[in-house]
């Protein structure tokens, strides 16, 4: 199996070979991302394998990152640092974060 970093570089090379970094826009790639997310939703709804859909989403996200000199790892680090101390609770199977008001007091999640 190919390592993550090698595979990420192969995907970047694939994008460049097809002019999908310089020849596309963030908005076009966002539209593509929504298309891939919809395919994921359909396969989840029908209890079908969705590994290709997740992979396609990652391919588009790598494109968006590359055009802004980021990596998925960079973005995951930012996201993790944002959530690592987050508090909240589960509501209908989804984690809802507590809110912090202007005075810095934590308000319980809905």
Residue ranges and their predicted role:
Residues 1-54, 58-110:
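Flexible "arm" and connector segments at domain edges
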